[in-house]
């Protein structure tokens, strides 16, 4: 396990955002190139030389930078191998991003979807490229000069999520994206079933006790909203000169409609806090707790102020997110 003292977020070298394509993750780029030149909207200039790089830092879907000269686009497809039913839904992500950009500037615009597996080996879609910095455990060099950087990006993220949760899905014809009635109950029951499939005797009773506690205190949603389902700092991008505003949010393939506090609970689950065990790495990136980020209670205050939601029961949502994460890690 990483320990926080192993990483200095303001001195160590950040991971590169682009790399050559990893072994075993190349596509048939000749077929892809021909398809994109023929199928992308006419306003996109595809006359230049074709080139491919990979965004290497994601842990799930495969994400590539495809270029036609100066034109840069992002191609996404599921990972190779067996996939869980409903996971890595490129059609859903395309559906969301082909509409959401119209009312939410932090959503990249999707241009093209293809479910013909002879093109990329699986369903895939293409979207605009956003340029900026993704903050993981190490602060990008282009942002190290900012005062109070951690606090500012925390406030910006809380404001961005609150704005996202205020949107009306009907404004972009996405009101049928999910089934908000009974959403929270289905989340708990669904993750209980997943846990039962991989249950470990050492933790079985504790997980069942947590399930019973969650079910006994099931919250009533305050509004129906978009739910991203994987909101965390490293799914967000900032422009180097502006830590006070999120430039883009990524990984929309699990987006649905439901209780927005499910999203906020997910964020809290990933968020480091000064009171955390120093050997626990929240969010998967050592160094985050040395970045000056707001505490979880401060982040909750910022989000409550912007969203106008009652967060007196926020601990239920955080507990659910932790219980869900335990099930994910056991799989």
Task: Give short role names for the model-derived ranges.
Residues 27, 92, 122, 149, ...:
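A generic structural signal for residues located within well-ordered alpha-helices
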